[in-house]
């Protein structure tokens, strides 16, 4: 729940590009999926990025951002999963040059993080009434979590993008996930799976804020009711002002041959609405890769 924007390619406004045009040449990203780290169920993962920033005015230079994480999940009384995660995010700024002041410098930032969550899962598996070779699995997954990110003075660091200004976080989150999966057993013994419906809702409480500590309520929805239709949207609702602050909608339509059509709509508060249609490559959207194993 730390990331509330669910679209991979945010649209940059022309005003932003005109105010602070900046290039990244090159930008290299490396991520390591969670790997078992010890005999105990401790997993190691890594997100890292190198980028070299160039622009006509202001500060330019290179940045290395490394975020290693240790994750320790454990079962409690066969019904609950308690998970802890610790990280030490380090960001190094190299060969930094301020064109306005004519200064060269290097700097770095270290941000310890900690996360703990408690969750459970209610599961029901049932057959299809119209097809004996198909199974459905419905899960309801409530979760409460706590996330802490330490404070660090970042005023003297370069400001290239959102990575350079990360606010202190001390948050309690409550969320609920509702998921419907389907699995079809094929005559050759293989099977195919599809996530038909996914909806997640939640809200967090910021312990560092005395006024209006509750965040926007956020809702994420995605659905693939057929093999040729995919729907996705996310929404943020401001309970203090009683208004929708952010809404994004996406519709993908495609056929057996690989032709596809993409419709998008984006709304962000007082900014202008945006609607567009395009024909991008449609890639996997991270459907769940674990499922039940009953034979038909």
Pin down the residues of each PLM region:
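Outer-membrane beta-barrel proteins and related beta-barrel translocases across Gram-negative bacteria
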Residues: 1-296
